[in-house]
Swiss-Prot record:
Residues 163-279 form the HD domain. Belongs to the YhaM family. This is 3'-5' exoribonuclease YhaM. NCBIfam families: PRK13480.1 (NF010007). SUPFAM superfamilies: HD-domain/PDEase-like, Nucleic acid-binding proteins.
Amino acid sequence: MAKGIRHHRVGEAVDGYLLIKTATKQIASNSKPFLTLILGDHTGEIEAKLWGISPEDEATFVNKTIVHIQGDVIDYRGRLQLKIASIRPTSAMDGVHLNDFVRSAPLAPNDMLDEVNQYIFEIHNPHIQRITRFLLKKHQQAFLESPAATKNHHEFMSGLAFHVVSMLRIGKSLIELYPTLDKDLLYAGIILHDLGKVRELSGAIDTTYTLEGKLLGHISIMSNEIAQAAKELEIDGEEVLILQHLILSHHGKGEWGSPKTPVVREAEVLHLIDNIDAKINMMDRALERVQPGEFSERVMALDNRSFYKPSFHKKPIEL
């Protein structure tokens, strides 16, 4: 394909290579099996249906398989879908590689690490700084590679680090506006809040939940890691308890996955920053393929809303 899958619009033909990110077998109303495929490249992903499959198809078109595909982009209930005309698995003769299809953060991993470490250097409370530095160093490589989620926001290679860097920048601006905020707590909370996802999620390709992720979740994982780090570093103080509270409450409410609601000011601010960055990322992704004067496809995680790009934004999409 001359352009990435995320930049295709309704009515356009697709003829190129895509990665099967997920393949889910389902049964149609006529009782015949079919596959729902999530296909992607380094720009994004699109859903497709493979109808009337055989057992051989089911065994062939599986997760992490690169395929050559032809078809057309259609609108299905407000979302883009690829209508498949032909599909085949690739071979060595095609000269394509898995890494070519993995979407990555727009910043280099080492640059993001340098920036995060600079924020850690600005943490003056020795207990908070030591715990934060200890845990980041422990999970450094996974932190730089992991996505921030399986779907919805920052669900790409190095997405976790990019999410953290973006949140730190927001946090710094808020501290300049509200200087009574505890910078040490807020920076540490931002850096650590999703670090448990390096154990909760399987990686950047075909991201799924690990057994530990399903049974415990990243919030409980990181709360426990903070306690263990404090023990190893022989740190005993209220800072440990407050850091754990920031982690346990950063989703805001029980129905959103938090065991506790925020009752420390920096915990509430952490939750708000997390929410802002995640939602802006989702809206940006939805509007990437939209021309001025058009609505995006529906975003399930944002109340199934379609977002409008104002018509006075005349600059065309750069493909």
